[in-house]
Structure formats: structure tokens, C-alpha cells
From Swiss-Prot:
Residues 151-432, 783-1078 form the ABC transmembrane type-1 domain. The keyword Transmembrane applies. GO terms for cellular component: basolateral plasma membrane; membrane. ATP binds at residues 518-525, 1151-1158. Disulfide bonds: none annotated. Residues 1-147, 207-268, 312-375, 421-770, 855-909, 953-1022, 1071-1427 are cytoplasmic. The gene is mrp-5. Residues 169-185, 290, 397-399, 792-833, 931, 1044-1049 are extracellular. Highly expressed in the intestine and pharynx. Expressed at low levels in the hypodermis and in some neurons. This is Multidrug resistance-associated protein 5. Keywords: ATP-binding, Cell membrane, Glycoprotein, Membrane, Nucleotide-binding, Repeat, Transmembrane, Transmembrane helix, Transport. Heme transporter required for the export of intestinal heme to different tissues and subcellular compartments. Also, required for the export of vitamin B12 from the intestine of the mother to the embryo to support embryonic development.
Length: 1427
């Protein structure tokens, strides 16, 4: 959220581009003027860029505020990146942390640029409503900067072309035929002038090249930030994502944003680079003549080859991206539902699915890699082949070839190579950018969450004269992209008929309370979603003020922050309203259990809160708002009856008494409290009126209500036994008693992997791990030899040409004419060794080609093998990791490894490594040749090398730290996006989209700043190393002049040609080495997960393999003195638990939140290791049983029914063990057969992400059917009916009683009606076993009332037990904070040390569970059953 120190300044300048730009208090007046000038499209919008053209600037406006210093850079600092130097200098002095990375410039911030891009996008949609183009919008967005970059780069090419064509050629000609004075002495001044000219043009080339990247980097950052921010804004404001998932959006942030950045930054090189071919062709025709057409033809042939390779790479990359999306989507589901995967022993099943996705992905990556490597391998071959064919043709045709012409031509060929190399670069980046833009455009075209018309009547808050809503948009029949393969979690076609929600006439007045009831799947929730604006309609006639409407979905959404943050939700604190919301939602006592109360951090998705606490926090958030209309979707589903009744009384009947309210409920007892009841069937409101009138006059309504009440009565629904969670809490409630600081301090060190900047140097073991993963040292040795042979053959071809030229021109013919001797040099064509040299020249060409193909193919195989093994090791470590790892590690952080890091290892790391090896070996070869030609060069090379070592060694740490900072800054960004999408409906209805967008901008700018700093630091190294090579080139040229006559022109020309080529290759080699090391951080991060995630346990132990296949046959469970402690610093979650459950016995477990109920179940599944003690199943210590055997022998039905994307069959039988008849039988027993038969594909029908195309009740029945198929002897239900209506609850209870009659059944209960018919009931308190007896013993007689109440701010749970009818009940004098009249006075409190029981005297014969409340003074004692 925006910090308190930020000053929000909204620019009010009409309907301009920047109406809602947020300025911090550090934002300069110059920046604000820039925004205004850009808004008005005046020349002033270029003022910021013009400032960088000032040669020298000394002001440092951003020195102390963390802003980017590029805004204050002068021209020299801008083009040489000297403004980065202070940061790199700090890196030399010690370890840097993330906070020292300079922030993003205001001019590059995503907020400012998103505003402009949004206007352009809206203009495009208006101009081309049917087919708007994001490509056109981005072009308009960057056109000025793009063409300016192209112009600068054009000058760079001109400078680079002038050097070899004008000055180097003349320098070599000077060496061949030096200018002499009258005394035949060489005149060096002309040669020195040529050296100076070469130095100047090379210096200008380097600076203009650096300027090109400086402009392009800022352009790329602006495009990436603007597009991602606009994407997030559109997604956050969309009605529905139309089948797209969180992982799809995160994948765009992780990969597509970077692809846009790469495409934009390389665009000037791709657009202008090929122009050098035109200049090269003209020069060669002028100098070499018509035979140069052979070389030109070679370039065009290779152009065609490169184009084919590029096209193939494009197609393969597109398919690879689709396959990657499928894998990431499945990984997101696995991580999200990891407990379900583990408890069912499905690790191998999902490993097989991921392995299959990975294989499909590798096929396309391999093809793309081959195309890319062959394109890279073609690069060095092209100028050599062109030169060989050109020179051989010239010589064999009888023409002479001078060294000056030959080596200037070779230099030009290598300059032309730049244009050739841009083709694979351009093809790759363009292909990926096109795919990225196409995918992003789909999100930008999502239908937006628009406001409804506001009703005119003052006393009416909602008015509808007839409307029909669906979950699918109007354009549901849009054409399908044939080239795009659907991801696993996409709902391609939902076979069920399109669900519609209709109501002819509906109005709600102020202060009117309306209940919505109906059977499971009838459309109750749909009505609330339609009113809140989250469904699609074609005939909307609904009028409601959405800004005055609050919607609370059944599944509570909690974001990572404090409890107070979640309740205030961006609003200012109002103590009175806040207290009423917290107190009315029964949160006061819960806050006292947290170490810092409502300032306690709740973790990702509220990880440290139970399900009931999450629901009440979400409700308090809504109650804190002062709105006119409240929409509650079964908010009491995850709460016990007592707590629900209290909240209903305090919140619904009192606090919201004068507000309009519509609430979905399954509690028939509450209907008489509502003014009206809506009865829903099949998506239609079939009855609307007062409960009593409908009950008397509407038979269907009466039948439904009677059925629900009968079920509740016959099942003995009384008081609850705890406010159990609606979803499985990642950490058991015992951990809740520890502060968020404890969680952070004691959490796995894997968390600090993201927080710590790590060591500044990549350890050698990381390289060894990569080498071993690739196949070991032998294969790498062969690969390096292939690179060396390829480079040597390349250099040898030029060396051999110099030998040929030298040999041919050194031969002489003596002519005798009397006493005169005339010595004449023969031409190269007349030399008798021409054939030999030409043949060797051609052999070098063959070796060069073969070695290039060899190293390209082998490198692709080696790098992909390494990536595959690293991925597989990490995946196996994650899926078999301990549950505690997932408790303490955010989902986005894990997905970051499988998406961004694996993309680096799959694609970018191999490319960088291949280029590094090629260029580094080439540079070493060039230096060897130069030194052999000019031994004096060593005198200069030594100090140059020292300068080089100082440059590289001093700043490698800073560059690597910047790369780590970029990695670290991604995780908060992804976590925020993921959390936002999970709570999108809440964000909409609470009008918080803008606030969450501001948080996104903050995270995105932080990430953009790190990316820009890293790229700028890399370019700093490149520029200064290029300048170092310019000095080296000048030295070689000077030696050529000074040693004229002692060194052959051919050798001198070869040395100069190699020195000039090094100007680009050397810095690229060093930069790619540093970039390679930076990209190795991805290998480091992946390897860290692979090696450091604690294991879940032995998958198959030796003892486990010897156990009979029928184990467990009886289902007997024994706990012997079992203790459980989640972390060393935490108290015992289970304390000395000993009990025995007989085979086939039905046991209910009750206790308050934090009592240890879920911990006990966790131990049976071995989700956590036992601290002390032993657990036996059928007499076998479960620690000796493999996890797969143990967990597949136990069935688990969780509270939150979730299905995986795929098919119905896969969700019922993922291991394909059962026949169709067995599956249909299970579906029939679970009352799902009719539903599945109605689907077009029956068992092969598609299931969407999370099973969202089925209702909650249907998903729960599917989970029950899955457990039924397994035929386990032990079944554990973690309150499987907590979130379903009474009808579904009844079905589930019937299935449990009939189908699992012979199995051992353990029910973790939050409703007493679900355990009162058990054989025995286990009562846990604070991790201790308080009581384990029959329901008859626990309840005694019918007149005994067992109450385990929820606690409010000064009241604790109690069990009122009447021994006779003569007890009395009095009103507590200390109950001033309670507005209920039914408060019992504790007259006598006595603690029984042996039974841990508090006795209460009450004095009323009819103590009702729903109305009595018990006060007690002990702060940590629950009132228990009196035996």
C-alpha cells in the first residue's frame, strides 16, 4: 500500500492523460511539469530527455532519496553510463542489500507511462472496435524514442563503416608502400594521422552505440511497466477472467513482460542493422569488383537460411510457450492443493503429468534451440565463406589481390556479419513479442466491471424490472485460435448447459433484510454475484448504487498484512465503528490470543488464521464499511451455531438493522428474523415474501423448509463444538498463539533465500552441478574442443590468407639485360603455390562448417539435458518436500522458480553460454595472432590487462547483486498479483481497485528499477571495455606505422583486422561472461530448492515394502505418548496423547480452535514428524511404512472441496485403477450419477481450475466419491460438511453411514450433530486429551446440554451441565459489554485438578443453548463436561 510518507497529488488538468498520476513528496517540480507538458502534448514533454544532452551536469537531485540518477546525468555520463559508477563502487566496498538499489525514475515509472498507454489503447479501441491492435498502440507509444534510437544507431554504423573502408585500408596501403621523403626515409606523420582518425571514428562508434542502448533500455522499461500495469488494471476491473487463471497472469508478468522489453531494446538493431549490408555491398563492388558478387551471393544465401531458421524458431517458440503455460498452470494447482496431493499419495501421479508436460515442452525447446544454435554457428562462417570464394575467384581469374584490399574487405565482411546476426535475434524477439502481445491483448479486451444505473427512489437501494445473467460473456462463441493449445486449467467447453440466473422483478428498500434459500446448485450465490456485477447480461434492467454495496463471498479472502489492515481495507481508522465491527464479529477474544493483537501479521492468504477466524475478519471488513446494501453469501457456513447466532444478533439485527441486507443462508431457524425470503430454484426466484406467509401458502417452500428442519432436528443439531476452519489452515491453529515475528524468525531458511542478497560470487559448486547435470566432464570436454576447433579454423582461414598474400608477393623474377639486373615481384595469380594455398583455404572452410554444426547440435543437447535434470530434481524436491516448507513459503515464490528461473535455464542461459564460449575463445585467438605479429604489443598488453582485470574484478559483485535484486523484487510482485486475483470480487465491491493498483505500481517500479540498473551496469562494462579495445586498436595501428618495413603488410593487415573485430567481440565476451554468471543465479536458486527443501519422509521404506498389500486390514489406530511440536521455539501442539481406536469404530473429535484436532489428523498422515511417541495402525509403527503405502491406505475428505483441472475421471481416479462400472457405482452412491450423465462427455467431461464449474456441494460429493472408490479402512473427514447446505450435509452423512459402515471413521467436527451418533467422542483441549468416551457418557441424559461456546472479548467457552432441575441462573453483573439479556452468572467456580473441569451452578430448568452465555474469570480455562 502507499506509504504514509507519500503525498498524493492528483493533477486536475481537464480530461488529460495524467489525471490520476500519484506523485511522491520527492517528485521534483520538473517532473510534474513534464507530466503536464506530456498531457498537453507540447514540446515541453521532451524537456527531460533534452537535459541529458547537456555535456556535463554536476547536480545530484536524487542523491539521498533513492531515485535513479540517470535523470541528472549529462551527455557523457549518459552515453558512458558513468552515473552507475557510484553504485558499483559501493559494491566493491562490501555487501549490498536490496534497499541500496536505486529506484525507478519518475519518467520511467509504470504509473506515468500506463496513463499515456491507456489513452492510446482507448483511442485504438474506438478506431478499430472489431480488431484493435496492441502492436499499433505500442508503436505509437514508443515511435519517437524508437526512431531516435534508430538514428543514433545509424550514425554508429556509419562510424563503424568508415573505419575499415577509409582509414584501415589506407593504413595497410601505407604499410605496403609507405610515403618517403627525398632521402627515402619513411614519412610517419601520414600514418600517425591515419591512426588518429581510426581512433576518433572508433571512439565515436562506441559512444553512439552506448547511446543507442541507453535510450532503448529506458524505452523498454517504459513499455514493460506500462503494459503490465495496464494489464493488471484491466484484470482487476474485469467482471470475469473467462477461464484464465492466476498462473496465466503471473506467467505474463514473469515472461511476457521481459519478452516485450527485449523486443523493444533490440528493435533499433534489428531495423537498422541490415542496412550495413547495403553499404558493404557497394564498397566491395567498388574495391574488389565483380568477383565480390560471389561473397555477396553467399550473404544472400545465408540470409535465406537464416530466415528459414528464424521462421522455424518462431514456430517452435510459440509452441514451447504454450507448453510452458500448461506446465506452470498444473504446478500452480499442485502447490495450491499440495495437502490434498500428499494426503492421497498422488505425488507420483502428478509427477507423471508434469513429466509429460515437460517432455512436450522440451520437444519444442529442442527444435527452437537447434534453429538458434545453427543461426549462431552460421554467423562466423558467412564472412569466411564469402572471403574465400571472393578471393579464390579473383586470383584464379588472373587478377592481383593486394593486402590492403583483402583485409579491408575481410573487415567489411565482418561488419556485414552484424546485419546477418540481427536476423536470428530479430526473429526470436519478434516471435516472442508477438505471442506476448497477442496474449496480453486478450486480457485488455476483457469486459470491465462497470457501474449499474442508480435507482431514483430515495427509500429503494435496488430495483430490477427483469434481468438475465450468465457466467459466460456475450462473446462466448468467439473464434478459437487453432494454433493455441488450451492449458490444462482452461475451461474450453463446459458441457453443462449455460447456467442462467433470472429474476423478473426485485426491489430492496432501506432497512429491509432478505434471506435467500434453496437447494445446492440452484443459483443462490449467482443472484448475489449478479447484483454485485460479477456476471454477464444482455438485458440488464438492474439499478443499484455499486459504490454503496458490499459483497462478502462464502470463501473468505484475507491478504498478507495485519488483522487491522484486513478490516480497515484502506479506509481511515474510526475507533467506534472498528470496535463495533470487531466486537460484533466475536473477534475480541481471538485478538487477545495473538501476541500483538490486531497488529499481528496473518501471512499469505491468512495462513496463521483458522477458517472461522478468516470468515469473521472478512465479515468485520464489510461491517466496518458504511454502505446502503450488504450482500452476504452464507457467511455463517464455517462458523458454529452459537457463534453464528451471536453474530446474527449483534451484526444483522443490531448494527445493520437500518441497512438493506440480502443474505444466502442454510439455517432455517433464522428465517423468521428476515423481512422477506427469496426461494430459488434453477436460477429463478420462484417465491418472494414473508417467511410465515410463504410457509403457509407455498407448498414447495414449505416442503423445502420442513426437509431442512427435519434433518437438523433428527441429527440432533444443538450447539457447536468450535468454530472450525472453512478451509485447511496450512499451519495448525496451535501456531496461531505465536506471533508473526516468531513465524518469520523461526521459519524455514528457505524464506531467507528470497530476503538475503546471497554471496556476491557464484560458488564453483554451482557450475559443477550444471556441468554434471549436462552429462559430466567428458561431454563438456568434447564440446569445448568443438568450440576450439571451430574458432581456430575461423582464425586460420584469415591467417592462411595472409600467408598466401605474403608468399605470393615475396616471390621475384630476375631479368638480365647486360650488366643491369631488374627484380620484379610476381602477382598472386602468377604464383606457383596459388593452387596449394587455395586448396588449404577450402579445407579450412570445410572444417569450419563441420565443427560449427557439431558444436551447435551438441550444445543444444547438453544444455537441454542440464535444464531437464535441474527441473526434475527441483520438482521432486518440491513435491516430496515437507509440509512445513509450504506453510512458510509463498506460492508465488515457488512458482517463480518454475517459471522465470526455468525460462532462464531453458532458453537464455544456453544462448548466453554459447555466445560466451564462442567469443571468448575467438578473442584469445585474436590476441595470440596479434602478439605473434607484433611482439612489442605485449609491452602495452600487460598494463591494458591490468586495467581490464581491475574493471572486471571490481564490478562483477555489483552486477551480480543487481541481478539478485531483480530476482528478489519479482516475488513480492507475483505474490501481490496472485493475492489480488484471489480477492478480485472483494476488491471490486469495496472500491479498492485503485489502491491495489498503486501497490502494484510500487512493486513493479521496484522491479523495473532493479532491471534497469542491472542492464545499465552491464552496458557500463561494455562501453568501457570497448573503449579499452579502442586503445588497443590504436596501439596495433601505431605499431603498424612505426614498424613499417619490418612487418609484412599482410601480417599487419591481419593484426589490424583482428584488433578492430575485437572492439565488439571482446566486450561482448566479457559482458556475456558476467551475464552468464548472473544467469547462473537461476541455477543456484533451482539447486537450492533441489538440495535444501526438507524431505517429507521415506517414500518407500524397506519395512514398508514388506507389509501385506491388504494393510491396513482392520483400521485400528493406537497413539502412545505422542507429542508434537511444529518448531523448536513453539509450545507443544499435542502433549502426551495416548488412546486406542478400534477397527471399524466411528470416532468424533471435538475441541476449540487450537486444541489439536487437525494436528492429530496431520500425524496420522505423517504430514509432520512426531516429536516423541509412536503411532501404530494395525500394530505397525507408521514410521516404518512408506508414505505412499500409508497415505493410500487412508482416505481424507477435506473441508475445502477442490478439484483439479482435467476430467471428471481424472479427479475420481487419477491413477486409472478402477473400471467405468466401479466409478459409476461410486457416483450413484454419492448422488452424482445423474449430474455426470447429463454432461456431453460423461466421465471425460472437462473440469475447470479448482472445479469452479461445479457448486461447492457437488465438489464435496465428488471428493466423497473419490474416497469411496479407494475403499480405505480408515477415513478421516475434516468437517466435510462445514461449507454446504443442509441438503448436501444430509446426503454426505447418509453416505458416511452406509458406505463406510465397516471402515474406521474419524470426524473432526465443528457441529455436534455430526458426531453425536459416533461410537465415541474425543475431546481435546490445548493439545491434551481431556476426555474420550461414548456420546451417552458425554451427554449423560437428554436434559443435559453440552455447550462449547465461542468466546468474546471478556467471556470464555463453557459447558453448562445440569445435574438436576433445581439449578438457578442469574444475570452477570460484569456483563456490561454484552447486549444480550441471557447472561449467566458464574456463582461458584472450582477447578478440578484431576479432570481439568470447571463446575458451574445455574438456576434455570430450561437452559437454552441459543440464548445463555456464561461468564468466567479464568483467562485460559474452557468450561468442560462434568463427569
Amino acid at each position: 500500500m502507499p506509504s504514509d510518507s507519500e503525498e498524493v497529488c492528483l493533477q486536475q488538468s481537464g480530461t488529460g492523460v495524467y489525471e490520476n498520476v500519484v506523485y511522491s513528496k520527492e517528485t521534483s517540480d520538473r517532473a510534474k511539469r513534464y507530466a503536464g507538458d506530456t498531457n498537453r502534448k507540447t514540446i515541453g514533454r521532451y524537456s527531460a530527455a533534452v537535459q541529458n544532452l547537456i555535456p556535463l551536469r554536476t547536480t545530484e537531485r536524487n542523491k539521498n532519496n533513492g531515485g535513479s540518477r540517470i535523470d541528472d546525468a549529462g551527455l557523457f555520463s549518459f552515453v558512458t553510463y558513468s552515473w552507475v559508477f557510484p553504485y558499483l563502487y559501493q559494491a566493491v566496498r562490501g555487501k549490498l542489500d536490496r534497499n541500496q538499489v536505486w529506484g525507478c525514475s519518475f519518467y520511467d515509472s509504470c504509473g506515468l507511462n500506463m496513463a499515456r498507454l491507456e489513452v492510446l489503447w482507448e483511442d485504438e479501441k474506438k478506431a478499430n472496435a472489431k480488431s484493435p491492435s496492441l502492436f499499433k498502440v505500442i508503436y505509437r507509444f514508443i515511435s519517437t524514442r524508437l526512431w531516435f534510437s534508430c538514428a543514433v544507431f545509424f550514425f554508429c554504423l556509419i562510424f563503424g563503416f568508415i573505419g575499415p573502408t577509409c582509414f584501415i585500408r589506407r593504413l595497410i596501403a601505407f604499410a605496403e608502400n609507405p610515403e618517403r621523403d627525398e632521402q627515402s626515409r619513411i614519412v610517419y606523420s601520414y600514418g600517425i594521422a591515419l591512426v588518429a582518425a581510426i581512433s576518433v571514428v572508433e571512439f565515436a562508434r562506441v559512444l553512439s552505440y552506448g547511446a543507442t542502448w541507453a535510450v532503448s533500455y529506458r524505452t523498454g522499461i517504459r513499455v514493460r511497466g506500462a503494459v503490465l500495469a495496464l494489464l493488471y488494471k484491466n484484470v482487476l476491473n474485469s467482471k470475469d477472467l473467462c477461464g484464465k487463471t492466476e498462473s496465466d497472469v503471473i506467467n505474463i508478468f514473469a515472461n511476457d513482460g521481459q519478452r516485450l522489453f527485449d523486443a523493444v531494446t533490440f528493435a533499433p538493431l534489428v531495423l537498422v542493422g541490415p542496412l550495413v549490408l547495403v553499404g558493404g555491398i557497394g564498397y566491395l563492388l567498388m574495391v574488389i569488383g565483380r568477383w565480390s558478387l560471389l561473397g555477396i551471393l553467399v550473404f544472400f544465401v545465408f540470409d535465406v537460411i537464416q530466415f528459414g531458421l528464424g521462421k522455424s524458431m518462431v514456430a517452435c517458440r510459440n509452441l514451447a510457450i504454450v507448453k510452458t503455460e500448461k506446465r506452470i498452470s498444473m504446478m500452480a494447482e499442485i502447490i495450491k492443493y499440495i495437502r490434498i496431493v500428499k494426503m492421497n499419495g498422488w505425488e507420483q501421479i502428478f509427477s507423471a503429468k508434469i513429466d509429460q508436460f515437460r517432455k512436450e515442452e522440451k520437444v519444442q525447446i529442442r527444435k527452437s534451440g537447434y534453429a538458434q544454435s545453427l543461426a549462431i554457428a552460421c554467423g562466423p562462417v558467412v564472412p569466411v565463406v564469402a572471403a574465400i570464394l571472393t578471393f579464390v575467384g579473383v586470383v584464379l581469374a588472373g587478377n592481383d589481390l593486394l593486402a590492403s584490399d583483402a583485409f579491408s574487405a575481410i573487415t567489411v565482411y565482418f561488419v556485414m556479419l552484424f546485419g546477418i546476426r540481427m536476423i536470428p535475434y530479430g526473429s526470436r524477439y519478434l516471435a516472442e513479442a508477438v505471442v506476448a502481445m497477442r496474449r496480453i491483448q486478450e486480457y485488455l479486451l476483457l469486459e470491465q466491471y462497470a457501474p449499474y444505473p442508480v435507482t431514483n427512489a430515495e427509500d429503494v437501494v435496488l430495483d430490477c424490472q427483469g434481468a438475465t445473467y450468465t457466467y459466460q460473456p456475450k462473446a462466448a462463441k468467439a473464434p478459437v485460435d487453432e494454433t493455441k493449445e488450451p492449458t490444462e486449467n482452461e475451461v474450453i467447453v463446459v458441457e453443462t448447459p449455460v447456467f442462467t440466473c433470472s429474476f423478473d422483478k426485485l426491489s430492496i428498500k432501506r432497512g429491509e433484510h432478505i434471506a435467500v434459500i434453496g437447494a445446492v446448485g440452484c443459483g443462490k450465490s449467482a443472484i448475489l454475484k449478479a447484483i454485485s456485477g460479477h456476471m454477464f447480461t444482455t438485458d440488464d434492467a438492474l439499478s443499484v448504487d455499486r459504490s454503496q454495496t458490499v459483497y462478502v463471498p462464502q470463501k473468505a479472502w484475507i491478504f498478507n498484512g495485519t488483522v487491522q489492515d484486513n478490516i480497515l481495507f484502506g479506509d481511515k481508522m474510526n475507533s467506534e465503528r472498528y470496535y463495533k465491527a470487531v466486537n460484533g464479529c466475536q473477534l475480541t477474544e481471538d485478538l487477545t490470543t495473538l501476541s500483538v493483537g490486531d497488529r499481528t501479521e496473518v501471512g499469505e492468504r491468512g495462513a496463521t488464521l483458522s477458517g472461522g477466524q478468516k470468515a469473521r475478519v472478512a465479515l468485520a471488513r464489510a461491517v466496518f464499511q458504511t454502505k446502503n446494501l450488504y450482500l452476504f453469501d452464507d457467511i455463517f457456513a464455517s462458523l458454529d451455531k452459537k457463534v453464528a447466532n451471536k453474530i446474527h444478533e449483534e451484526i444483522i439485527q443490531k448494527l445493520l438493522k437500518k441497512k438493506a441486507l440480502m443474505m444466502v443462508t442454510n439455517n432455517m431457524e433464522l428465517l423468521h428474523h428476515f423481512d422477506r425470503v427469496l426461494f430459488v430454484e434453477g436460477g429463478n426466484i420462484v417465491a418472494d415474501g414473508n417467511h410465515d406467509i410463504l410457509y403457509e401458502k407455498n407448498d414447495a417452500y414449505k416442503t423445502f423448509v420442513d426437509a431442512c428442519e427435519t434433518y437438523q432436528a433428527t441429527s440432533g443439531a444443538t450447539s457447536p463444538c468450535g468454530d472450525g476452519p472453512a478451509q485447511p489452515a496450512p499451519l495448525d491453529a496451535e501456531i496461531l498463539r505465536n506471533s508473526s515475528e516468531d513465524l518469520k524468525g523461526d521459519a524455514d531458511k528457505l524464506i531467507s533465500d528470497e530476503e538475503d542478497m546471497g554471496n556476491s560470487t557464484i560458488a564453483w559448486r554451482i557450475y559443477k552441478q550444471y556441468i554434471h547435470a549436462a552429462g559430466g566432464w567428458p561431454i563438456w570436454t568434447c564440446l569445448v574442443i568443438g568450440f576450439i576447433v571451430n574458432v581456430v579454423s575461423n582464425i586460420f582461414s584469415t591467417y592462411w590468407l595472409s600467408r598466401w598474400l605474403k608468399k605470393g608477393h615475396d616471390e621475384t623474377t630476375t631479368i638480365t639485360n647486360g650488366t643491369e639486373f631488374l627484380e620484379m615481384k610476381t602477382s598472386l595469380a602468377d604464383s606457383p603455390v596459388t593452387g596449394f594455398y587455395a586448396a588449404v583455404y577450402l579445407v579450412a572452410l570445410v572444417v569450419l562448417t563441420i565443427s560449427g554444426l557439431f558444436k551447435a547440435c551438441v550444445f543444444v543437447k547438453v544444455s537441454l539435458t542440464a535444464a531437464t535434470r535441474l527441473h526434475d530434481r527441483m520438482f521432486q524436491a518440491v513435491i516430496h518436500g515437507a509440509t512445513s516448507f509450504f506453510d512458510s513459503t509463498p506460492t508465488g515464490r515457488i512458482l517463480n522458480r518454475f517459471s522465470k528461473d526455468m525460462d532462464e535455464i531453458d532458453v537464455k542461459l544456453p544462448f548466453t553460454a554459447e555466445v560466451f564460449l564462442q567469443n571468448m575463445i575467438t578473442c584469445l585467438g585474436f590476441l595470440v595472432v596479434i602478439t605473434s605479429v607484433f611482439p612489442y604489443f605485449l609491452l602495452f598488453a600487460i598494463p591494458l590487462f591490468v586495467v581490464f582485470v581491475v574493471f572486471v574484478s571490481c564490478f562483477r559483485a555489483g552486477i551480480r547483486n543487481l541481478k539478485r535484486s531483480e530476482h528478489i523484487s519479482r516475488s513480492p510482485l507475483y505474490d501481490h498479483v496472485s493475492a489480488s486475483l484471489e480477492g478480485i470480487t472483494t476488491i471490486h465491491t469495496f472500491q479498492q481497485s485503485n489502491r491495489f493498483l498503486e501497490v502494484l505500481k510500487k512493486h513493479l517500479d521496484c522491479n523495473s528499477g532493479a532491471i534497469f540498473m542491472f542492464q545499465s551496469a552491464m552496458r557500463w562494462l561494455a562501453v568501457w571495455l570497448d573503449l579499452l579495445v579502442v586503445v588497443m586498436t590504436a596501439i596495433v595501428a601505431l605499431l603498424t606505422v612505426m614498424l613499417t618495413g619490418t612487418v609484412s603488410p599482410a601480417d599487419a593487415g591481419m593484426a589490424i583486422a583482428f584488433a578492430v573485430q575485437m572492439s565488439g567481440i571482446f566486450q561482448f565476451a566479457v559482458r556475456t561472461q558476467t551475464e552468464l554468471e548472473a544467469k547462473m543465479t537461476s541455477v543456484e536458486r533451482v539447486s537450492y530448492y533441489a538440495d535444501n527443501i526438507p524431505e517429507d519422509g521415506e517414500w518407500n521404506t524397506r519395512q514398508g515394502l514388506d507389509i501385506e498389500s491388504s494393510w491396513p486390514a482392520n483400521g485400528q489406530i493406537n497413539f502412545s505418548e505422542v507429542n508434537l511440536r511444529y518448531r523448536k521455539s513453539h509450545p507443544l501442539a499435542l502433549n502426551d496423547i495416548t488412546f486406542e481406536i478400534k477397527g471399524g469404530e466411528k470416532v468424533g473429535i471435538i475441541g476449540r480452535t487450537g486444541s489439536g484436532k487437525s494436528s492429530l489428523a496431520n500425524l496420522i498422515f505423517r504430514l509432520y514428524p512426531v516429536t516423541n511417541g509412536t503411532i501404530y495402525i494395525d500394530g505397525v509403527d507408521i514410521r516404518t511404512v512408506g508414505l505412499v503405502k500409508l497415505r493410500r491406505g487412508i482416505s481424507a475428505i477435506a473441508q475445502d472441496p477442490s478439484l483439479f483441472s482435467g476430467t471428471v475421471r481424472f479427479n475420481l481416479d487419477p491413477s486409472l485403477e478402477y473400471s467405468d462400472s466401479m466409478i459409476w457405482e461410486a457416483l450413484e452412491k454419492c448422488h452424482l450419477k445423474t449430474l455426470v450423465q447429463s454432461l456431453d462427455k460423461k466421465l471425460e467431461a472437462d473440469v475447470s481450475h479448482g472445479g469452479n464449474n461445479f457448486s461447492v456441494g457437488e465438489r464435496q460429493l465428488f471428493c466423497l466419491a473419490r474416497a469411496l472408490l479407494m475403499k480405505s479402512r480408515i477415513v478421516i473427514l475434516d468437517e466435510a460438511t462445514a461449507s454446504v447446505d443442509a441438503g448436501t450435509d444430509k446426503l454426505i452423512q447418509e453416505v458416511i453411514k452406509t458406505v463406510f459402515a465397516d471402515a474406521t471413521v474419524i470426524i473432526i467436527a465443528h457441529r455436534l450433530d455430526n458426531v453425536r451418533n459416533m461410537d465415541r467422542i474425543m475431546h481435546l483441549k490445548n493439545g491434551k486429551l481431556i476426555n474420550f468416551t461414548t456420546p451417552q457418557e458425554m451427554f449423560k441424559d437428554d436434559w443435559s446440554v453440552y455447550k462449547l461456546e465461542d468466546k468474546d472479548d471478556d467471556q470464555h467457552s463453557a459447558v453448562v451441565v445440569g445435574e438436576n432441575s433445581e439449578h438457578s441462573m442469574e444475570k452477570s453483573s460484569q456483563g456490561s459489554s454484552q447486549e444480550s439479556d441471557d447472561i449467566v452468572k458464574v456463582e461458584n467456580e472450582q477447578k478440578d485438578s484431576s479432570d481439568d473441569v470447571v463446575h458451574i451452578e445455574s438456576g434455570d430448568d430450561d437452559v437454552k443453548a441459543d440464548s445463555s452465555e456464561v461468564k468466567e474469570t479464568s483467562s485460559d480455562t474452557d468450561i468442560e463436561v462434568v463427569q
